């Protein structure tokens, strides 16, 4: 390692024996030999690491050369397919950029059209449709209002017995009925005098005798 010959080594031992003496010379020799071993091991590890790195570099270079040679030796069909794929990718990129540019926000140069003149003739507004639906529902509302008023009047009349109800129906059929508008019924409230007259008619009907019902078999 250090290129020391036998004569030089013998000279070093003689100098060490004179300087250190026979007692400390063996200890000095052992320490020096240990240092030499460590230095040799370090040198060996460094050499191994350098050799491995050189081998890896050579392998990488060889792989690159093989790849380049394989690309150069490709068949024309593979080259054409690769070119088509590249062109398709570029076309997709261009179409995406065009779509993104066309979808511009509503700015001063591209305002939102809200004027009635800009609406097409075939488009109809939504307000007439709502008005037609409201007019279609108006008769149903009027019928419901009249039914509720009639029910309230019928519930307000006192019912004593089944006979009075039957006689009341006969009386109602015999008397003429006048048409009353929904507005008149809603506007005119029922007074106390009218309630008293209804009560008096009910008591008169209950006090009267039972009506005779003619059947085909004879009188009852």
From Swiss-Prot:
Organism lineage: Bacteria, Pseudomonadati, Pseudomonadota, Gammaproteobacteria, Enterobacterales
Subcellular localization: Cell inner membrane
Species per Swiss-Prot/TrEMBL record: Yersinia pestis
Residues passing through the membrane, by range: 1-21
Protein name: Sec-independent protein translocase protein TatB
Record's keyword terms, sorted: Cell inner membrane, Cell membrane, Membrane, Protein transport, Translocation, Transmembrane, Transmembrane helix, Transport
Known partners and oligomeric status: The Tat system comprises two distinct complexes: a TatABC complex, containing multiple copies of TatA, TatB and TatC subunits, and a separate TatA complex, containing only TatA subunits. Substrates initially bind to the TatABC complex, which probably triggers association of the separate TatA complex to form the active translocon.
Domain of life from the UniProt record: Bacteria
Main function: Part of the twin-arginine translocation (Tat) system that transports large folded proteins containing a characteristic twin-arginine motif in their signal peptide across membranes. Together with TatC, TatB is part of a receptor directly interacting with Tat signal peptides. TatB may form an oligomeric binding site that transiently accommodates folded Tat precursor proteins before their translocation.
């Amino acid at each position: 390692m250090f290129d020391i010959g036998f004569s030089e080594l013998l000279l070093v031992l003689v100098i060490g024996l004179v300087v250190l003496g026979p007692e400390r010379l063996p200890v000095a020799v052992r320490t020096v030999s240990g240092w030499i071993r460590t230095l040799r091991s370090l040198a060996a590890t460094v050499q191994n690491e350098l050799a491995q790195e050189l081998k890896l570099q050579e392998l990488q270079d060889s792989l690159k050369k093989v790849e380049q040679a394989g690309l150069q030796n490709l068949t024309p069909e593979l080259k054409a397919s690769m070119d088509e794929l590249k062109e398709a990718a570029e076309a997709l990129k261009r179409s995406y950029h065009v779509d993104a540019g066309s979808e511009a926000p509503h700015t001063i140069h591209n305002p939102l059209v809200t004027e009635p003149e800009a609406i097409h003739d075939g488009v109809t507004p939504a307000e007439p449709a709502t008005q037609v639906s409201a007019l279609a529902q108006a008769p149903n509302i009027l019928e419901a209002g009249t039914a509720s008023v009639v029910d309230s009047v019928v519930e307000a009349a006192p019912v004593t017995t089944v006979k009075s109800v039957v006689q009341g129906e006969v009386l109602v059929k015999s008397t003429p009925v006048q048409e009353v508008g929904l507005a008149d019924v809603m506007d005119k409230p029922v007074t106390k005098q009218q309630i008293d007259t209804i009560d008096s008619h009910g008591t008169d009907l209950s006090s009267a005798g039972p009506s005779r019902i003619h059947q085909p078999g004879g009188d009852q």
